[in-house]
Amino acid sequence: MALILDTGPLYASLDRSDADYAACRRLIENTSEPLVIPAPVLVEVDYWIHTRLHPGVLVALLDDIAAGAY
């Protein structure tokens, strides 16, 4: 079975200032299930990263996706 990530938890795992950052990082890092990011979620996360964070965060996320982390 796979863990399908939604925008909120995925974004929270990338934004250290988010109140749920630590919990979302733990969930993503410690699950044994394959992680899946639906295309619409990736589009939303891209928007939030560009509005609230730094484009380098998106580059790191895309690198992780290319490496098979998601």
Describe these PLM feature segments:
Residues L62-Y70:
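Short, intrinsically disordered, charge-balanced linker/junction segments flanking boundaries
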Residues M1-I37, H50-D63:
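Short, well-structured N-terminal submotif of metal-dependent ribonuclease cores
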Residues P40:
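Histidine-centered beta-alpha loop that forms part of the nucleotide-sugar donor binding/catalytic region
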